[in-house]
Amino acid sequence: MGQKIQPHGLRLGITSDWRSRWYADKQYADYLAEDIKIREFLSEGLERAGIANVVIERTHDRVRVDIHTARPGIVIGRRGSEADRIRGKLEKLTGKQVQLNILEVKNVDANAQLVAQSIAEQLVNRVAFRRAMRKAIQGAMRQPQVKGIKVVCSGRLGGAEMGRTERYHEGRVPLHTLRAEIDYGTHEAHTTFGRIGVKVWIYKGDVVGGRRESLMNARDERPSRGGRRERPRRGGARRQRAEKKQEG
């Protein structure tokens, strides 16, 4: 199960948070399609900016878009011209006032999405896929918070006639452990031989404290189904009389 499912979706509410934060009843499908268009517009228009994540929050008359990027200067532009252009496009797309927040990703080598984008860019530039994968693994493992990394590339690797899948990993990546903080990212490299898919999993240790700790404490307080409960001892009155005689 943990090997197949998307790691963020499996751990929602445990170690990861929602990337679309709003509630809707009848307009749910419209808002969802709108979020997809917003993310597609940002990923296609700001491909060189290294966008790691896009978080969207909605109120009744405003849309807040948080862009986590490795190169905030490209998103902002000269004197904020690029940010104003993006805000105008998003307001035209949503029909509401847009609050645009640009946040810098400090540690690029520990972000799975940025690592996947870096590998894909190297594949487009005709770098050997094994060299690109090993370089990404070495850069990630040098970070103190990274406990393990797994990289998968699929497609016509090296221009081969038949597509195949290559996997490299180092350290631990426990995909079945729900308390494990797993960062996941994907990207596609459009080469002259066709598309090559890149997937990256980065393990940053177990989450201790917060909501997860409270859930564990609540579970420990409940009696287990198969556990034996302590039963009251029989013959209590007779035993008490015998104990009183011994004391007397």
Curated annotation (Swiss-Prot):
Name of the protein this chain belongs to: Small ribosomal subunit protein uS3
Region (Disordered): 214-248
Cellular component GO terms, alphabetical: cytosolic small ribosomal subunit
GO molecular function: mRNA binding; rRNA binding; structural constituent of ribosome
Quaternary structure, from the entry: Part of the 30S ribosomal subunit. Forms a tight complex with proteins S10 and S14.
A biological process from GO: translation
Free-text function comment from the UniProt entry: Binds the lower part of the 30S subunit head. Binds mRNA in the 70S ribosome, positioning it for translation.
UniProt gene name: rpsC
Keywords: Ribonucleoprotein, Ribosomal protein, RNA-binding, rRNA-binding
Bias kind Basic and acidic residues: ranges: 214-229
Family: Belongs to the universal ribosomal protein uS3 family.
Basic residues composition bias: residue spans: 230-242
SMART domains on file: KH
CDD domains documented for this protein: KH-II_30S_S3 (cd02412)
Signal peptide: none
All copies of domain KH type-2, residue ranges: 38-106
InterPro entries in the cross-refs: KH_dom, KH_dom-like_a/b, KH_dom_type_2, KH_sf_prok-type, Ribosomal_S3_C_sf, Ribosomal_uS3_bac-typ, Ribosomal_uS3_C, Ribosomal_uS3_CS
Organism for this UniProt entry: Corynebacterium urealyticum (strain ATCC 43042 / DSM 7109)
Highest taxon listed in the record's lineage: Bacteria
Pfam families, sorted: KH_2, Ribosomal_S3_C
